[in-house]
Amino acid sequence: MKVALLAGGTGGAKLAAGMQAVVGDGLTVIANTGDDIETLGVYVSPDPDLVTYWLSGQVDEVRGWGIKDDGFDVFQRMARFGAPDWFGLSNLDLAACLYRKDFMASGGRLTDAQAQITRGLGVRATVLPMSDQPVRTRIKSSGEWRGLQEYLIIEGGQTEVEGVQLDGIEEAEPTPELIEAISSADLIVIGPSNPVISIGPILA
């Protein structure tokens, strides 16, 4: 059985792990990339990586995100040097993000970089970014537009949301792999993820 799951965030990632236990490599997760951000010299893809960590059994289940038993030594040392310290990345998380940055800087696609990461972590399912073109979710609050991660982490997600926009969505296209996953699926599932910032960018 082939299942295509649209997901982003912890809820969708947990469902993906449960589905993989049932359908194995018949599962394809189409993950939101509107949260993606470049920081500390690396390319961070939070939702695809969160899904990957749940699927590989490496996630910190207490927090619901990140890698269990992983430290922040590299991040903390970089912060001592004056690097931005608002977006924390653990050691193994940094490794994935550094690999992705280097892979894409050499001309590789985001889709292929994620495939290498999932394969390296022994994931049976397929994890596809929603597009290889950059899409960035931006939030308007207190009269200013800012990236989603800045809003959630720096602002704490506490100020009233006045607007949401997806920068780059008009240029973004689905990949051949994504189209194949949808067209060949016996079942298409929209995961229990935030409908505006996780599912919305995928459907847009």
Residue ranges and their predicted role:
Residues 10-11, 30, 193-197:
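Short glycine-rich anion-binding loops that position phosphate/pyrophosphate groups of nucleotides
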Residues 14-27:
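A short, Lys/Arg-enriched amphipathic alpha-helix followed by its capping loop at the start of a domain
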